[in-house]
């Protein structure tokens, strides 16, 4: 397959399908709703859509917990709807990126259902199982969503690893059969006609096989980062993926690589590396100085933001390609975060940030609603939040006495992922033109 660099001239628009456009009045966005808005997206100047996961899922983490890699989630539509989306988008010169979630599956995936049945089940080694240590977890790692990163399973009296929710068990990439299953699935979707992959937490698929304790860093659990992020076989796995799948198609790839350095980004995305086209780095959106990660009310330092952006522009130039983003489904709204969402300054802030984004070298990623200057929702009651991360951390940190409830609620208002997940505001009506029914989450 002749490969081209078409992605260097692309403008990518991220759709969070649950919140984009509901076509049937059930309060949940869907594929026909996306098709309905393709002309709007073309007029906007978009030529690539990255659509967050639309595959079968119990929705513990809004689709990032996949239970079947070859079926469309029923509330979003059917495979026929998805094929029509591909056809209609391609007619308009718009390409489609699939969100590839292969660090973990849902615990309702058939592989995991089989894996937990017995220690000698053929699927046992599809996941990461360890014996208890002194009757407790195999090590002190904490999950990215709060609580321990290990879940005890009484069926076989062992623990399985989940770096995210307990309903998101990590796949064992050391197992060649797992890797082949993933590559077969990727080839299936490429044959359907998709144009590439955004790879969810892809830098976490290779783990240090000694599973040592992590540093506590003032929290309740140890940090898994040094042992699971940019792990010992990560580049070997991605080069194998390139040989088995990516080199066969003229597709675009971008990897989510939390904590990546300039040097590491060159390994992932250097043109001679045969791995990825680009990565998402998060240095410009990382919180500094909090014992509890992002849960703080400290204001962002805009001068520091500019320094980070300049550094990545200058030091990656000619070595690897930059991805450019200010927000996504995991971040607060960029206008509220980096600008000023006071009505007097919201529009000016949004235009300033858009100018910043589109005038740098790299591929820009616009998150749905960013083009309208959408702001944080500032929900002030816990029951208004749907995000598993927000709810679990609120409970964990307040129950442990590490944060006062009022302060933690202020943190949620500023930092919760739900700020980005309120329905797209198509008009100024009560339900924002998103749905005729009751929206799954409150309208901003």
Regions found by a protein language model. Give the residues of each.
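Active-site and adjacent substrate-binding regions of carbohydrate-active enzymes
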Residues: 1-444
């Amino acid at each position: 397959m002749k490969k081209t660099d078409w992605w260097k001239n692309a403008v990518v628009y991220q759709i969070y399908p649950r919140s984009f456009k509901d076509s049937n009045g059930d309060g949940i966005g869907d594929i026909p709703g996306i098709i309905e808005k393709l002309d709007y997206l073309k007029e906007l100047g978009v030529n690539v859509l990255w659509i967050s996961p639309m595959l079968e899922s119990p929705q513990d983490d809004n689709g990032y917990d996949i239970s079947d890699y070859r079926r469309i989630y029923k509330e979003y539509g059917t495979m026929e709807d998805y094929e029509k989306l591909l056809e209609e988008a391609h007619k308009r010169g718009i390409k489609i990126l699939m969100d590839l979630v292969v660090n973990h599956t849902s615990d309702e995936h058939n592989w995991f259902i089989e894996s937990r049945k017995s220690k000698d089940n053929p699927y046992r080694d599809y996941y990461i199982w360890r014996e208890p240590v002194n009757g407790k977890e195999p090590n002190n790692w904490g999950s990215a969503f709060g609580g321990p990163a290990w879940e005890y399973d009484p069926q076989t009296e062992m623990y399985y690893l989940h770096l995210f929710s307990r309903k998101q068990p990590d796949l064992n990439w050391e197992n060649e059969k797992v890797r082949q299953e993933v590559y077969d699935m990727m080839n299936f979707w490429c044959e359907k006609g998709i144009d590439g992959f955004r790879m969810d937490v892809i830098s976490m698929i290779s783990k240090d096989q000694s599973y040592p304790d992590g540093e506590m860093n003032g929290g309740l659990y140890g940090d898994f980062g040094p042992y699971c992020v940019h792990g010992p076989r990560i580049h070997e796995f991605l080069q194998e993926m390139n040989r088995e799948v990516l080199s066969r198609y003229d597709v675009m790839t971008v990897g989510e690589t939390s904590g990546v350095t300039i040097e590491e980004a060159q390994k992932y995305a250097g043109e001679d590396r045969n791995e990825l086209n680009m990565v998402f780095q998060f240095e410009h959106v990382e919180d500094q100085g909090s014992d509890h990660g992002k849960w703080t009310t400290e204001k962002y330092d805009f001068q520091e933001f500019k320094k980070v952006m300049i550094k990545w522009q200058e030091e990656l130039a000619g070595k690897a390609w930059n991805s450019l983003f200010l927000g996504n489904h995991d971040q607060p709204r960029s206008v509220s975060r980096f600008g000023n969402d006071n009505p007097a300054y919201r529009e000016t802030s949004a235009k300033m940030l858009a100018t910043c984004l589109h005038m740098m070298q790299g591929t820009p990623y616009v998150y749905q609603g960013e083009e309208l200057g959408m702001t944080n929702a500032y929900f002030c009651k816990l029951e208004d939040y749907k995000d598993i991360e927000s709810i679990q951390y609120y409970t964990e940190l307040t129950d442990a006495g590490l944060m006062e409830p009022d302060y933690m609620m202020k943190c949620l208002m500023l930092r919760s992922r739900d700020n980005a997940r309120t329905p797209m505001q198509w008009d100024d009506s009560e339900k924002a033109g998103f749905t005729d029914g009751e929206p799954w989450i409150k309208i901003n």
